[in-house]
Structure formats: C-alpha cells, structure tokens
Regions:
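RNA substrate-binding interface of SAM-dependent RNA methyltransferases
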Residues: 1-72
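Beta-strand/loop-alpha-helix module characteristic of Rossmann-like adenine-cofactor folds
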Residues: 9, 74-76, 150
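Glycine- and other small-residue-rich loops at beta-strand/loop junctions that grip anionic moieties
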Residues: 25, 49, 101, 126, ...
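A short acidic, often aromatic-flanked loop/helix-cap motif at beta-alpha or helix-coil junctions
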Residues: 55-61, 78-80, 127-128
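Active-site/ligand-binding-proximal alpha/beta "capping" segment
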Residues: 70-111, 117-122
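Structured adenosyl-cofactor binding patch, chiefly the S-adenosyl-L-methionine
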Residues: 106-150
Length: 150
C-alpha cells in the first residue's frame, strides 16, 4: 500500500530501511517493484520510481545526498502545525523518513539530532500507521512545494 500511494503522489525514489524497531527484515524488493509498476500504470505516470535495496537507518542517514533536507516524521515531537514548519523552510528536493511500527528508537533520534540536514516534523497528535504517515507527509510537502514533476 505504501509504495503504491507514494508512487501515485510522485515519489521518485524509495529507500527502505531497517531500523531498530522494524518488525520484519524480510522485505521483498521485487514484490515492491511490482506494486510500483502497477501504481504507475494505474495513475498514468510517465516514470517508474527507483527502489533501492534494504539498508540500515545509520547507512541511509550517513549517505544521504548533501543537497537534500530530510523531513523526519517524529511522533514524539510536541505538536506543531506541519504547514507552519514547512513554510519556514526554503529548500527543493527532500527525503521523508517514516518510522516503523513502534517508531524510531532513542538511539536513532540521537543520530538525527546530530545531522544538520534534518528537519523534524510532527504529523499531529495521533500515532499513525506508516502508510498513513507517508501519505500525510507527502501531501503536506506537496502543498508546500507544488508539483514535484516541474
């Protein structure tokens, strides 16, 4: 569901990560690719998003492109309207980090706090499933940045 909806919303690349609270280590990249292609066909898209191999949280964070901010969806962050946060920022391409069931660990939060490219955002007072959080974050970003395909 997550890759389908995110593909429909214009995501260009998926970086599946294993964090300390990830429930399964057996994510089938091939199965996800099939879902991505189905979503592209369904919505009439003109590009197929890339999906990288499963990687660790630390490795993705350490190797994230320097020219992009990371929107870190943090359910422990005191609620602040996401649009207010996004409107204060001036940047182009972003990566959005969505946590697993159980959220990001304290250790992972500490890693994020040390990274100057990370912007912590709240998706509201509710604890959302990863799929819902992804759609919510992408929709909020899309309302700030306009159409990603420009």
């Amino acid at each position: 569901f997550l890759v389908e909806k995110c593909t429909e919303l214009g995501v260009r690349k998926f970086l599946p990560i294993v964090s300390q609270n990830t429930q399964t280590k057996r994510i089938s990249i091939e199965r996800l690719k099939k879902h991505i292609i189905e979503a592209v066909e369904q919505c009439g898209g003109n590009f197929v998003p890339e999906i990288q191999t499963l990687n660790t949280f630390q490795n993705v964070l350490d190797n994230f492109p320097d020219n992009r901010k990371i929107l870190f969806c943090d359910e422990t962050l005191e609620y602040e309207n996401i649009q207010n946060t996004l409107n204060q920022l001036d940047f182009g391409k972003v990566g959005i980090f969505i946590g697993p069931e159980g959220g990001f660990s304290l250790n992972e939060r500490r890693m994020v706090e040390k990274n100057s490219e990370v912007v912590r955002i709240s998706l509201g007072k509710r604890i959302l499933r990863a799929e819902t959080a992804a759609v919510s974050a992408l929709t909020s970003w899309h309302s700030k940045s306009g159409d990603w395909t420009k």
